[in-house]
Amino acid sequence: MSFLATLKEPGTSVCLKNEPAQSPSLHDHAPSTAAISREYIANLFDMPFMDLLLKAQGVHRQHFTANAVQISTLLSIKTGNCPEDCGYCSQSGHHRDTTGLQAEKRLEIDKVIAAAKRAKASGSSRFCMGAAWKHPSAKDMPYVAELIKEVKALGLETCMTLGMLTAEQSEQLAEAGLDYYNHNLDTSRRYYDEVVSTRSYDERLQTINHVRKSGINVCSGSIVGMGESREDRIDWVLELASMPLPPESIPVNLLVPIQGTPLGDKVLSEGQLPVLEWIRTIAVTRICCPSSYVRLSAGRESLSDAEQALAFMAGANSFFYGDKLLTTGNASQSNDDRMMQMLGLIPEAPKPKLTVIDALSGHQSQL
């Protein structure tokens, strides 16, 4: 069997010689989520790097079109002065004296729509909108609902990240037609208190549960390289894979250390995580959450073409387009276009939810 045939037939029973009996087989199909244990995830992390990437790419091709990537654009619709104290974030009001970030009010709706039109013209299929809030207020909800409707009218998928949500707010976003809601876990439960103190881990899980129950697709990921251990990365993957339904979209961020933030200063002082460990995390995420989109998010700006190519080989199939992610830099659009052409990557078309209205009851539902 040739190497290429092995890639196309990841279910083959061929195994590596001398492979530990407890380890995941190189060519196994992705396990059911019920079969994923902490030991299984730890063994994935311990696999030889090339074997892990080969396995992850095989799993990826079982569930997604090879070389197709979903492209998103992210816009900050309200910047800075956030009451949360996330140790990595320049938008926190707790760090404004050391980061120098200038807070901005909510963007006018017409400016957001203009940005969405530019995103669509550039090739993005999803438009993501983020606000530096602990949670949206009642007066914010009509504003965000209008944004969702206007962006969907352009034929784009919609995503929002607005902080914590109540069950009622989740329902309001669903009624407006929101496709995805982002609420990252950031790290493991064990390391979480080193990252933020103003929002608990369980509160994050509660918001994700509200979003899931409302019928909105869940987007939830991590930030790798904040000083956490591999054990924390194992626990984070297990948390997602153990959910009744893992997130449809999983961003795996590589920390961009921002001077003036507690975690940024810590990493700049102690040294950054090797990029290959971030790529390992992507591969393990792909294997354990095989039906989820795995997105390259923050941290790409500093990566070489080869490092990003390895990330796509590891099973990533989504990334953010545009020169800026909220307040941090991103790889330039022209550079991404060049890289996609070089790697043979193909943009995926948008698949926004459709609103169906029952002719008798008038009830609206999403397809």
Swiss-Prot record:
Cofactor(s) in the UniProt record: [4Fe-4S] cluster; [2Fe-2S] cluster
Keywords: 2Fe-2S, 4Fe-4S, Biotin biosynthesis, Iron, Iron-sulfur, Metal-binding, S-adenosyl-L-methionine, Transferase
Any one Gene Ontology molecular-function term assigned to this protein's record: 4 iron, 4 sulfur cluster binding
Pfam families xrefs: BATS, Radical_SAM
EC number: 2.8.1.6
Record-listed [4Fe-4S] cluster binding positions: C82, C86, C89
Swiss-Prot/TrEMBL catalytic activity: (4R,5S)-dethiobiotin + (sulfur carrier)-SH + 2 reduced [2Fe-2S]-[ferredoxin] + 2 S-adenosyl-L-methionine = (sulfur carrier)-H + biotin + 2 5'-deoxyadenosine + 2 L-methionine + 2 oxidized [2Fe-2S]-[ferredoxin]
Pathway noted in the entry: Cofactor biosynthesis; biotin biosynthesis; biotin from 7,8-diaminononanoate: step 2/2
Domain Radical SAM core span(s) in chain numbering: 67-291
UniProt: [2Fe-2S] cluster binding residues: C128, C159, C219, R295
UniProt xrefs under PANTHER family: BIOTIN SYNTHASE, BIOTIN SYNTHASE, MITOCHONDRIAL
Assembly behavior: Homodimer.
NCBIfam families (UniProt xref): bioB
Full protein name: Biotin synthase
Organism of derivation: Psychrobacter sp. (strain PRwf-1)
